[in-house]
UniProtKB/Swiss-Prot annotation:
GO cellular component, one term: cilium
Name of the encoding gene: Ankmy2
Keyword Amino-acid biosynthesis in record: no
Zinc finger region(s), MYND-type: 320-357
Protein name: Ankyrin repeat and MYND domain-containing protein 2
Binding site residues for Zn(2+) 2: 332, 335, 353, 357
Organism phylogeny: Eukaryota, Metazoa, Chordata, Craniata, Vertebrata
Organism: Mus musculus
Domain of life the protein comes from: Eukaryota
Amino acid sequence: MGHIKKGELTQEEKELLEVIGKGTVQEAGRLLSSKNVHVNCLDENGMTPLMHAAYKGKLEMCKLLLRHGADASCHQHEHGYTALMFAALSGNKDITWVMLEAGAETDVVNSVGRTAAQMAAFVGQHDCVAIINNFFPRERLDYYTKPQGLDKEPKLPPKLAGPLHKIITTTNLHPVKIVMLVSENPLLADAAALGKCYRVMDLICEKCMKQRDMNEVLAMKMHYISCIFQKCITFLKEGENKLDTLIRSLLKGRASDGFPVYQEKIIRESIRKFPYCEATLLQQLVRSIAPVEIGSDPTAFSVLTQAITGQVGFVDVEFCTTCGEKGASKRCSVCKMVIYCDQTCQKTHWFAHKKMCKSLKDVYEKQQIEAAKHKRQEEKNGNPNVSSNHVNEDQPEAEEGITQENSIPSDSVEGEKEAANDTGLASAQDAPTGPQLSEE
C-alpha cells in the first residue's frame, strides 16, 4: 500500500473501524495482522483508526494501534484534527499521555486555529490541558545523561533521569507535593543528587529562553522546581529527616488564620529569582502577585499554577489542604472544613490544623444553621428549589463526626510547644493523627 486516500477502505479496514468502536483488542489485533489493513488508513472524513480509538476513549486499542505503527501526528482529517485533539476532547487523561509519549505534536492547529490544549480547554477538559501543557519528552532529559563535548561525565546520572522526569511532568506544582516526591525516592533525597538535578533544570530553563521558539512557561516551571530543589538541599544538609522539617515549615500557619506564610514567601521568592527579567510571563506574574497582601487571594501558588498548567481556579473541584492534589475527598470529621487525599496528608497537616480545627468547626456549624434557616424560608415561600450559595445540605452534620474534645490527642500540649518554633522542628512522622477522616 504505497499511498493512502480518504474513504478508500478495504473490507478488513472497514471491519477494523467497527471493531474499534464495539469489538475487542484481540479482534483488532487479528485484523491488523492482515496484509489488507493499513494501520493509518483514512475513512471518508480523513480519520485514522487511532483517531477513532482516541475519540472513543479506548486506551488499550490506542496502545495496540501504536505498537503496529500508527501515526500519532497524522494531520489528514478534513478539519485538521489530530489523534491528540480527539484524546483531549474525550477527556481521557491516560490516552492523552499515551499520544504525547508516542510523539504527537502539541502545537498543530485545526481548521479553526486551535491546538489540542485549546480545544480541551474550550470543552472544559482542564486535566487534559494540564497534561499537554506540562508534557516534557523523556528524550530531552536523557540528553543530559550522556557526556557532551569535552565532558568526561554526564551532567545527570542516568539513574536520576526517571525520578526527575516524574517531577518535571507533574501537573501539581504545590511545594509540599514536590518535596514529598523528592522525599519518597531515596535516589533523589540526597543533597549531591539534587544538586545535579537542579543544575540540569537551570540548563533546560536557559535553553527554553534562548531557543528560537522561546518557551517561557516551561522555563518558569523548570526554574520553580529548581528553586524547590535548592530549598530541599538546604534542609538536607542540616541532617536526617530534614525534608520532614521543610514540609512542616511549608504547612505551618500563622496564629490569626492558619495561612501558611512561609509557603507563600517561598513561591514569591522563586518567581522573583527568575533570571530573565524581560520575560512577559514573569511580568504578568509580578503584576498579579505583587499588589496582593500575604494571606489574601489570589495566592502566589494559584497564580503560578494557572500560568504554568493552564488549570483555572473556578473549576468546581477540591484540592488537598496538605499537598494540593486535585480531587481530594476526605474531610476532617470534626470541622468538615478541610479536605485531604488520605490519612497520610491529614496526619502530616494535623500539627497545624489542630490549632484551627475548633474555630473552623464553629464556622461550619454557623453555616449549617444559616443554610437550614435559608431552606426553611425557601419552603415557606413555596420555592424550595431555588439554588443557594450556602454549604451543601448533603454534607454530614458536624455532630456525626468525632467530638472536638475526644479528637485532640493527649500529646497536643507538646504539639503546641513544637508549633511555637517557626520552622516546626519535629518530624511529620511523629505528628499526632488527630481526628479521623470522613468521606465527603
